[in-house]
């Protein structure tokens, strides 16, 4: 592989662009986004952005990946729902999904004619890996009258066995709107518990049965840490994801999807924020709201952190077979019906 050459002026301009965007980021222990770091990023981001044009590619970046990917080469950044919409709308020949494998599968489900690649095939998900399509079929035999709702953090074969997909931003409204009383919710047990609590609060009568998966990032937070943070930082706002435990969600000032958390912080005046989510989101907030103060407490997703500029470049330049997402067409169509049902039922902004 021959590295492309860029002029000193091109490299300096790219370094300045990156440093201006990333100078406030401080979200991953042991990493820096100072000027020297941006000098190291610049040849890669220039090469990737050149390759995107040559390959007719679009790069989708989840908010949990590192800032140099999001702001250096990403075409769209956001949560699972937003990025699934962008995949559905894409006309590009290639989609590079800087996230985890189930997200790239979702992009392939929604954009079947595109070549969809994932930078690291090892980027799994504790939720998505907790149940298979066979597991869902077994549960359906136990609860034949249940409507099967799958969280978007699930594999393509699980989506193919489900009636409707949901995200953390639309789960409450979609489940509340379903005519069935009995809901089989996979794979997130803690989100199911939060849905149960929210629907009870709304006066909606549903029996929610769940599988036993949890997110290794969000199930790690606890109310004792929240109480300690409130004692140390008067006026603190606590922001949590619905993948947290119901106890943590109840102790928070705001609970919502990644995108909703971003909006809440941007629109809320407070001296401090505690973000009970993945540290990548804190990185985005540090970049986009440098005037806000974040006190730490976030957690790292080891799967999201497998993404790197080098791997994005390699996936664009000459993707290996393991980086290319392939799906059986019958399975893809069944999974697409599940996701399309979500788009039909999701509240319109």
Describe each model-derived feature in a short phrase:
Residues 2-276, 281-349:
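Active-site loop-to-helix "anion-binding N-cap" substructures in soluble metabolic enzymes
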